[in-house]
Amino acid sequence: MLEDDFTNKELNKNFKHSILILAFKYEMDAADEVTRTVASKLKKSYSYLLSSEWQTESKNYNKIDEKELNDIKIEFEKIKHKPILYFETSGNLNQLEYTVDYYAKIYTNRKLIITIDHTLLSQKVEEYNDLELMNNTALCAIRLRKKYKAMIILLNQLNAEIEKPIRRENPLLQYPVKSDIHCGNQVFWACDNVIIAHRPELLGIEKYGKQKYPSKDLLHFAVIKSRKGRVGNIWLKAKLSQSEILTMSSSQLNEEKNIDLKNFKEIL
């Protein structure tokens, strides 16, 4: 869905150039990625589009009717004509760079947006470990950015530090930090912006951080580096039943917290 957002003219009114998105999807199948995007457009869950969403009333899985099927086909057809190219087979960094060069020569009038998801799945050639791979990935990204004035988005993963009991149980330690990024030092320096996405609910945290925000469906994007902007926190709510991600303000989160506290007192 990230790539699709860049093609949304309403979201990107200030774009002055046509774009081409080269999406290196080593982890998730491109078909799954596109299906999730279509589900979001139709405000349905991913499971619903696969006819695998359990219906409590009928005690059976959902069935897609003819109208819904037609709507789905229309959305898939729209995506076919968007400037996004998906690459599912992982290669080494030299092959990735060659691929970018190849398409840059074909689409000379477009600005490039390159996403790599995720970086640790690139094949190693001269690299002996993940640290060397991440360091070379950073160097590769810098070369491509300078060569084509491209936007490079690197998706990495967290290590296990944030899952430790001391982190989960201490509200002051629950926010993700730089050291939580796997091989973070090797790529942090190369990035203009670094954002860590975190779902505290998945770690069994009910009240998140020193603010004690309710964690149900909460997404926390910690902006820990912003070369031309400000560091801070972005709060979102996941409505998975409709494949939506909604923005939340701190005041809205505080309101939810107060409602939870009121309900707790009423139960007592």
Task: For the regions a language model picked out, list residue spans one by one.
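Signature of the SF2 helicase/ATPase Hel1-core->accessory helical subdomain module
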Residues: L121, Q157-K164
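C-terminal regions of RecA-like/P-loop NTPase motor modules
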Residues: N12-K16, K43, S47-K63, K67-E77, ...
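Hydrophobic/aromatic beta-strand patches that form the interior of the parallel beta-sheet core
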Residues: L22-F24, F87, I153, I195, ...
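A short alpha/beta connector and helix-capping loop motif
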Residues: E127-A141, M151-I152, I195, L202, ...
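Glycine-rich, phosphate-binding/catalytic loops in enzymes
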Residues: A39-K41, L131-L133, N170-P171
